[in-house]
Amino acid sequence: MSQDLRELVRSKVVIGDGAMGTLLAERGVGFGHPYARANVTHPEMVAGIHEEYVRAGAGVIETNTFSANRFKLQIHELEDRVREVNEAGARLARRAADSAETGDGALVLGAIGPLGRPLCPVGPVTEEEARSVFLEQAEALLEGGADALLLETFTDLVELRLAHEAVRRFGVPVLAYKTFVEDGETLSEGLPGRAAREISSLGVDLAGANCTVGPQRMVGIIEGMAAEVGPVAAYPNPGLPQLVDGKVRFRRDVDHFALYGRKLAEAGARLVGGCCGTTPEHVKALADALRNFRPENAPARSVGVRTVEEEEPEEVLDRPATELAEKLKTGFAVAVEVDLPRGNDITKVVEAARRLKGRGVDAIDISDGARARLRMHPVAAARIVQEEAGIEVVAHISCRDRNIIGLQSDLLGAAALGVKNILAVTGDPTQIGDYPEATGVFDTDSVGLVHVLAKMNRGEDLAGNSIGDPPGFLVGSAFNPTAEDLDGEIEKLRRKIGAGAHAFWTQPVFEIGALELALERLGDLDPCLLLGLMPLRSARQAEFLHHEVPGVNIPKPVRDKLSQLSLEDAPKYGVEVAQEILSKAQPLVNGAYIMPPASAPDLAGEVVKAVSTQRSAVS
């Protein structure tokens, strides 16, 4: 039975249903079996659970389709069954809602969850692709009989906006819920209210919060949301989960859930149900607790509905707060990469950094497990070098070894330790390193990591939560002017600039003409570049780099010349080549990034002599 949702929540508190996946798991839908697939493999079980919720008092039920989008079904090789799974889910809920046995009928919400893949620039999914995936699911849900559409458990409001843009064309009511982590700061910083205003400004029929926290913690969230936009929806978990015998379990204190369900209604929730871990017993207790509740009798509240446009945005300036950043703006900066040893003693690295500082180097670069080798964390090494050698460090951060939470945690730690020059890299595959069987995470890539750094420089983490004072990172990334697919490399450079990168460290260049061609092809782009220079030490090294290392091109005349020189004279020639390129390139770039052999970091000092001589021309 279809009803006007907006009118419904004005007149009373409506009871929602509870978890579907929790009960499916308890009743035998095994691990690895996507819950949405049960719509076609276990239809009677799904329909039966819907009916239990309606009998318990739910006036609104959700389809079993939270994870039924193309991307999530693709994990189980079910991407060609999106329409079938969603239509079946809507039909089963519709049947339960309209059953004479279960009462007067209930409203059916077609449930749509997040994509399960990150959006550009953090991940590969474009906005157009995202809308298409949401649209496909919504069409099938409405075809199956859903009365309205529910966008639930979103953390990213950009993704939520894209979902709403995709589904609003159908003219049916749309509800949209964000999930919050309530850790005290969430409330003190006013995030629920800000999120509610942003969600409501999209034009949704009802904003709300669901999942992640229990009913007690959700009360404060709902108070913040309702104070800004009026009536909202609340679907808490019963509490925090625990792992028992390899399975996720929640406490079943239905009285506690019902007690705080009433408090949620008093806080401004007009649609109250349950999320993960809740059961028909929770819903029945909730319905009993709210049976005689009337919104007009709730404690008086100050409610002011505003839109995002009415709020003056706080200006946050993205200003790198490092000496290297200043040097790149006002002069010509020199950075030298120094390799870390396998162990935890980096005394030689510190000593090399001191010597290089004395030769005029502005910063030391420390890689993050380059070529997938086990090394000390670059931030820890950077802190030691900065303290003991008195020179700034550029810490390379790779996306290979940490998920998106770990990456942000490391960056917060870097900021706290004073390591604020960060070079964002995707990372080499584990297959070429010390542990080829290790898992490569790659939640994002270098473009996405640049975006994360830029958000932190605006005082936010990736989810939009405040991190306090912006750290002032210098955001660096890589650019290869000698790439085989130069157009693709330039397009990626453009994306990195758009994501918030300040400067770019190039791959080693051995021919000035290649650099000039790349700069010409950049067109309207004018990136801050540190030119990569690698003083070659032997013909063997040159042949290896040219033939076996992607992205490195060494002209044949240089390789031939090295092959004619002794082991003593070859490094001298390698330095001469680097100096010559630098001399010609210095008017074209903002700095130099010297990569000496791991065993001979002082070779960079010979190149720096030429840099120092040239500096007066640009000072």
Positions of predicted regions on the chain:
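Domain-level signal for soluble alpha/beta catalytic cores
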Residues: 1-619
